[in-house]
């Protein structure tokens, strides 16, 4: 992952989540080893009020690896201030069972200088099929 100043924040976020998710789905590498390329060991990601530490994030990768078939990250906007990024993006996915699923994510995140995610606060909501991309 490139350092934050190396690319615009929208591109950094798109690349971060796309390459990470691609590795989760397609690589045979151990989940913990994979995580260490994208997250700090002391990571805390709070999603809709639920805190996820390193162990809970690693555990979350198992069902993602098993069930995710297709995915795309659509970054609507992102703003960087030093090592922090505020962003709004949509995850478009197709799972092993069921139809397409889209989730809007509003995230405030802190990264290390070398691009590892240290902390994130996320609010998410399901996006209805056909809802405009801006959606708010």
Regions found by a protein language model. Name each.
Residues 1-8, 62-136:
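A beta-strand edge to alpha-helix "cap/lid" segment located at domain peripheries
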Residues 2-41:
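Short acidic-aromatic low-complexity motifs
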Residues 13, 17-21, 39, 57, ...:
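Hydrophobic alpha-helical core bundles mediating ligand binding, dimerization, or RNAP-core interactions
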Residues 21-25, 43-44, 94, 113-116:
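Short linear sequence elements within intrinsically disordered, low-complexity coil regions
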Residues 26, 55, 100-103:
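Residue-level recognition of alpha-helix initiation/capping sites
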Residues 29-82:
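A solvent-exposed, acidic/Ser-Thr-rich amphipathic alpha-helical stretch
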């Amino acid at each position: 992952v490139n350092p934050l100043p190396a690319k615009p924040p929208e591109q950094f976020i798109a690349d971060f989540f796309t390459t990470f998710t691609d590795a989760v789905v397609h690589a045979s590498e151990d989940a913990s080893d994979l995580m260490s390329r994208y997250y700090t060991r002391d990571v805390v990601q709070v999603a809709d009020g639920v805190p996820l530490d390193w162990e809970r994030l690693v555990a979350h990768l198992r069902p993602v690896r098993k069930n995710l078939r297709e995915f795309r990250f659509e970054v609507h906007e992102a703003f960087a201030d030093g090592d922090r990024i505020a962003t709004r993006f949509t995850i478009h996915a197709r799972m092993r069972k069921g139809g397409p699923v889209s989730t809007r994510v509003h995230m405030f995140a802190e990264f290390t200088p070398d691009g590892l995610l240290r902390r994130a606060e996320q609010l998410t909501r399901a996006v209805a099929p056909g809802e405009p991309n801006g959606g708010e």
